[in-house]
From Swiss-Prot:
The lineage of its organism: Eukaryota, Viridiplantae, Streptophyta, Embryophyta, Tracheophyta. It is found in: Golgi apparatus membrane. GO terms for molecular function: galactosyltransferase activity; sialyltransferase activity. Interacts with GALT31A. This is Beta-1,6-galactosyltransferase GALT29A. Residues 28-398 are lumenal. It comes from the Eukaryota. It holds the Pfam family Glyco_transf_29.
Amino acid sequence: MKRSVRPLFSALLFAFFAATLICRVAIRRSSFSFASAIAELGSSGLMTEDIVFNETLLEFAAIDPGEPNFKQEVDLISDYDHTRRSHRRHFSSMSIRPSEQQRRVSRDIASSSKFPVTLRSSQAYRYWSEFKRNLRLWARRRAYEPNIMLDLIRLVKNPIDVHNGVVSISSERYLSCAVVGNSGTLLNSQYGDLIDKHEIVIRLNNAKTERFEKKVGSKTNISFINSNILHQCGRRESCYCHPYGETVPIVMYICQPIHVLDYTLCKPSHRAPLLITDPRFDVMCARIVKYYSVKKFLEEKKAKGFVDWSKDHEGSLFHYSSGMQAVMLAVGICEKVSVFGFGKLNSTKHHYHTNQKAELKLHDYEAEYRLYRDLENSPRAIPFLPKEFKIPLVQVYH
C-alpha cells in the first residue's frame, strides 16, 4: 500500500509546485496567459524530459560551407599593405594570377577606406594597424561556443547600461524588450503604444518610425543593424548613422570581414556605444537557422539528401536575417521578449517603410518563423543552446 501512495504523493507534490509557479507568473505578469506560464514552467527545469535531436541534422547544420572563403578573405586583407605600390607588389609576387576574390578584396579595401589608400600619414597608419588588429581578434573568436548565450549580458547589456548612466551594473536582465521587425504586416496593426511600453525597444536596420508611430511606436533603445548599413553610413561625414538619435547605442553584426574597417573608422566619432556581436554568437545563430531551414526543407520537399537543400538555398551565401539575430539577442538579455513585425502576407509589402516586395533568397524566413514559434511555445526544442540557459517568456504578435 505504501508503494502505491508514493507515486500519488509525488504527483500531487509536482502539481502543487507547478500551480505555485503558474500563480507566481500570473502575479508578476500584467498580461497573463496560460500558454506563457506553461512555457516558463518548462524553462524553469521542472519539466525535465530531454528533446532528442537528429544527430545527422545537427552535424550538417554545424558545417559552414563559406568557412574556406572566409579564412582566405581574412588572410588576404591581413596581408594587404595600405599603399597601392605595396599592394601591387604583393599580388605581382604571386605565382598565379589574382583570383576574382583577391581582386574583389582589393576593390573593397579601396572603396571602404575613409583615407586615400596611398596616404602615408601617421593617422592613416594608426587606423590601418588598429583595423588589422581588430580583424584578427574578431576572426579568432569565430567558433562554436554555446555558453556565449550566458555572456550576452556582460558583452552587450552592461556597456549600454554604463552609457545610460546606470550606477549599479548587474547581471540582471531587462524586464521587458520589444523587437520590432520591418514586415509590411505592421501596416495593418496599431501596436505603437504597446511597443513603447516596453523597457527596451530594439529596431532593425535603421527602419523609419516617422509617420508610422501608431503602428511601430517611436521609442528606440537599441539600434540593431548589419554591417552593410554602417558601410553605407560610412560615406557620410563623421559616419553619421543615427536616425533614432546620437545617444542610441548600435549593435551590429559583421557581414563581411572588410566591414571591420568601417567599424574601426566610425567608432571614434560615435557618442553612443558601437558594439559588434561576438563571432561566437554569430556562429550559434547560423547553426540554429540552418538547422531549422534544413529540417523544414526535408519535411516539405521530401528531399533525399542535404545536397538538394544547398542547391535551393544559395549554398555558402545562406545566412540568418538581422531580425533573427536581434530576437536571439533579446532572448539573451531580457526577462520577457515581445516580437512585432515578423511575418508576411501576399497583400503587404516586404518592408513597411520601403517599396521592396521580394525577399532575399539567402535568408529562409519561413524557417526563422518556426524558430520564433518554438521560442514562444516549445523552447526546449531549439538546438545548440546550453542546457543551463534559461529562455525567457516570448510572445509573437501577428
